[in-house]
Amino acid sequence: MNLIKQFEQEQIKKLTQGKSIPNFRPGDTVKVNLRIIEGANERIQAYQGVVIARANRSISSSFTVRKISHGKGIERKFMLYSPLISSIELIKKGVVRRAKLYYLRNLQGRKAKIREKIFSKDNQ
């Protein structure tokens, strides 16, 4: 293993210490709890939506979450190993046949709904 990959693996271990990252895929509904720092105050803000894309690039891994807020679609991209993410919760598992769900941007209402796969929280 070359030095860069070894260094990245060490950094990933350090960043995930004390946190559990669930095994989620595009189509799953997740709740991302973010640490927001405003001056001297620090608070946790939840962002819940459907994962429409995931990029697995070692320490630069990221995922995009889409939610509908006040009738408008909002997408936000998160770095998987960011220290600002306090936790990620898997809410629902979806059944999709694509790795990137960008087509959901053009759909509205029931057409944008994703079938749900039944799972137990213990088994994830």
From Swiss-Prot:
GO molecular function: structural constituent of ribosome
Gene3D superfamilies given in the database record: 2.30.30.790
Any one GO CC term of the record: cytosolic large ribosomal subunit
One annotated GO biological process: translation
Keyword terms, alphabetized: Ribonucleoprotein, Ribosomal protein
Pfam short name (any one): Ribosomal_L19
PROSITE patterns the record matches: RIBOSOMAL_L19
Family indicated by similarity: Belongs to the bacterial ribosomal protein bL19 family.
NCBIfam families in the cross-refs: rplS_bact
Protein name (Swiss-Prot/TrEMBL): Large ribosomal subunit protein bL19
Lineage, highest ranks first: Bacteria, Pseudomonadati, Pseudomonadota, Alphaproteobacteria, Rickettsiales
